[in-house]
Structures are given as structure tokens and as C-alpha cells.
Amino acid sequence: MLDIKQIRENPQLIQERLNSRSGTYDIQPILQLDKQQRELEATRSQIQARSNEIGKIVGQKIKSGINPQDPEIQALRDEGNSIKAQLSELEPREKELKAEIEQLILALPNLPSDSTPIGKSEEENVEVRRWGDEYLPQNPNIIPHWEIGEKLGILNFERAVKVAQSRFVNLIGAGAALERALINFMLKTQTVAGYVEVSPPLLVNTDSLTGTGQLPKFAEESFKCADDELWLIPTAEVPVTNLYRGEILAAENLPIYHCAYTPCFRREAGSYGRDMRGLIRLHQFNKVELVKVVHPSTSFDELEKLVGNAEAILQALKLPYRVINLCTGDLGFGATKTYDLEVWLPSSGKYREISSCSNCFDFQARRADIRFKEAGKKGTQFVHTLNGSGLAVGRTMAAILENYQQPDGTILIPEVLQVYLGREVL
């Protein structure tokens, strides 16, 4: 959530930064309503001051011995009653204006950072580095992961469709075991790196989704329970970040690092026709998420560390990947800066996103009211929040099924996973 004071004091800069994003955003309605609200507030304050003055005068006159029924006192009381009537009309309108302003601001995305490349689409993203060229598979006839998975009997899409609908998968035998091994390996790696594991609720309330920025703008992309004001989580970022909603944290307890494994649920509205086959874009998928709550002065350094934590998984699995600095037009709603990690999928000859690591600055903290206080200092400040995948489990499986695929159709198991599976080949 953007700061209304910042919008008010730097309207041209704010509008320019918003214009660099995809989509159309106009802050003029906010400025107009803000002007009305501030004028109304000033009027109400003046009237309230006069009401307080009248009360004081009346009290002094009565204390001095003047009869309470004196015409002068009665006139003051009549004026006071008139003021109360005015206040009863002004206060609801002021609250209404504040609510309208808040809803308009909630619809605005975060401002891109100065180090985010300017661009309107993913074609203008900037590649930062590549890793693992020496691990690129030499097999020229890679079978797509969904085909080899079904051939090996570890993936079944047809029965998942029967149970649910399209864009679901059933993992069987070694497929389910491989997924579990990946989850355990990812969590172990991140807890060793200093993250504290949490197992959060998979259903969250509206305030939680609003706090992290999915609501109100992206309601159609989430699954909502029909009879409850609860939503299935699209990512563990939502419940983990909101663990601290409405709290004032001690500065000495920052930074806070959490990792969490959860299933995630997304409608994928508007993506029909894209990645309809395989494990890339499902309605339900598993993910290990990394969340940081940090001091504002360290958030960009923490972003680099976060990317390194996600990269550590890919490097341990010896999966070729690249790091992309997203341009302003491809930036997520709540992010000020994002790096995507894209893993190599040889069947398509493309790098595909497997992790998105973002610094949300104070955007989520303002929405969720997460603050911190430094010992011996007055007042509080908003924390900065960060999140990233460490990693998307299904996409990691897809990358293994393709990059470790052998000419005879078997799949070598990455060395770091063999201890979890007790085997070397699928």
C-alpha cells in the first residue's frame, strides 16, 4: 500500500513510476478525494474547537454564579447544540472519504525500485547470470516430462481430471516419493541456512489476502469457500507474512526468516491455453516458500541473500538455470524489485520460471500494519517484507525428469536426493 503522504507530496514522481508498469493507474481521483477529506477535516477541527470553547465558557459563567437559565448561557448552549448537529453530519462523510481513498490506494501496485529495469513486457527483462551450462543434458531426444512421467507410471493426469478437473495431477509411487524427497531436501537446506520452519493455515481470511496484496485486485485468481469468509492460499507468503499482521516487533528481533511447505491453489484465470500439459501450471501445486521480515535499511541486501538461498537448491540439484531482473512492466503487484530464477527445460528448449524472489519494501507492511520499534527511540516504523520460492516443487520435478533423462528412458536421481529415496534411478 502506498503512503498517501507520499502521493500528496510527490504526485508527478508517483504517477511516472506507476506509468512505467503494465496497466493504467491514475492518482488524480485520490488527490481530489484527499483534498476534500483534508478540507473537511480542517472544517471539522475548527467547529470542534468552537464547541470546546463554548463548553469552557459556559462552565466558567456558571461557576461564577450566573444563573444557568441566563439568556446568554442559553444562547451559547443553542450554538453548541447546532455545532453538535453539524459534527454529526461531517464525521460520517469524513469517514466515507477516508474509506474511498483507502480503496483507491489498495488498487495501486508498489512502486518499482531505481534498480528495476524500465520496460513494458518480459522481453525487456534483463538477464543477470547463468549457472550450470556444464550440466546441460547431451541427450538430443528429450521426452517432455509429462510423457516420460506417464510412461514410467509416476504421473497420472487422466485420473486426476476424473477426481477434480483439468490442471490437476496424481503422483504415484516413486513420483510421490520424489516429491516428498524434494520437499524434505528444500526445507532442510533452508533451515540450515537460518530459516525457521512454520506450518501455517491453508485457509486465510480476507484481511490476510488484503495484507499481502492479492485482494481486492486479484480476487478472481483465488479460490473462495462458498459458506465462509475464507480463501485457499495461493502461496505460503500470505499466511506466513500475516503471522505478524497488526504487530509491533522489537527491532532487535529483526530480521525474521521463515520457510514453509504448503500446497498452493490458484485459478490461473486468463491463462487458458498456456502450459495446459504437465506440471508447469496447475490449480493445485506444492511449494516451499521463503519469507523475510527485515529492517528497512537491509532489505535490498536481504533480497540478494534470498536469491542465493533459492539458487542453492538448484545448484545442489545440478539443474542449469539463469537469474532474471524483471523489468517494471513484468513486476508483480506487490514487488518493488524481483529476480526470477528460470530453470532449463530441454524438451521445449526454454528456461522456465521456477522461483520468483521479491522485495516488497514497506508495501505489504503498510497494508498489514506490521511495524517495529527501536529501543530508546520514540515512534515506530514499518518493516520491509520479502518473499521467494525455494522452490516450486512440481516445476523442480519437471526439470529433473527432463534434465536427468537417459537415452533408455530412465531418470537418474540427483545425488542429494538419493539418501531420501534409497535408489539412484527411476
UniProtKB/Swiss-Prot annotation:
Protein's cellular compartments: Cytoplasm
Coiled-coil intervals: none
SUPFAM superfamilies, per database record: Class II aaRS and biotin synthetases, tRNA-binding arm
Gene3D superfamilies linked: Bira Bifunctional Protein, Domain 2 (3.30.930.10), Serine-tRNA synthetase, tRNA binding domain (1.10.287.40)
Biological or metabolic pathway of the protein: Aminoacyl-tRNA biosynthesis; selenocysteinyl-tRNA(Sec) biosynthesis; L-seryl-tRNA(Sec) from L-serine and tRNA(Sec): step 1/1
Binding positions (ATP): 266-268, 353-356
GO MF annotation terms: ATP binding; serine-tRNA ligase activity
Biological processes, Gene Ontology terms: selenocysteine biosynthetic process; seryl-tRNA aminoacylation
Matching InterPro entries: aa-tRNA-synt_IIb, aa-tRNA-synth_II, aa-tRNA-synth_II/BPL/LPL, Ser-tRNA-ligase_type_1, Ser-tRNA-synth_1_N, SerRS_1_N_sf, SerRS_core, tRNA-bd_arm
Catalytic activity: tRNA(Ser) + L-serine + ATP = L-seryl-tRNA(Ser) + AMP + diphosphate + H(+); tRNA(Sec) + L-serine + ATP = L-seryl-tRNA(Sec) + AMP + diphosphate + H(+)
Keyword Zinc-finger included in the entry's annotation: no
The entry's keywords: Aminoacyl-tRNA synthetase, ATP-binding, Cytoplasm, Ligase, Nucleotide-binding, Protein biosynthesis
Family: Belongs to the class-II aminoacyl-tRNA synthetase family. Type-1 seryl-tRNA synthetase subfamily.
Function summary: Catalyzes the attachment of serine to tRNA(Ser). Is also able to aminoacylate tRNA(Sec) with serine, to form the misacylated tRNA L-seryl-tRNA(Sec), which will be further converted into selenocysteinyl-tRNA(Sec).
Protein name: Serine--tRNA ligase
Organism: Trichormus variabilis (strain ATCC 29413 / PCC 7937) (Anabaena variabilis)
Lineage, uppermost ranks: Bacteria, Bacillati, Cyanobacteriota, Cyanophyceae, Nostocales
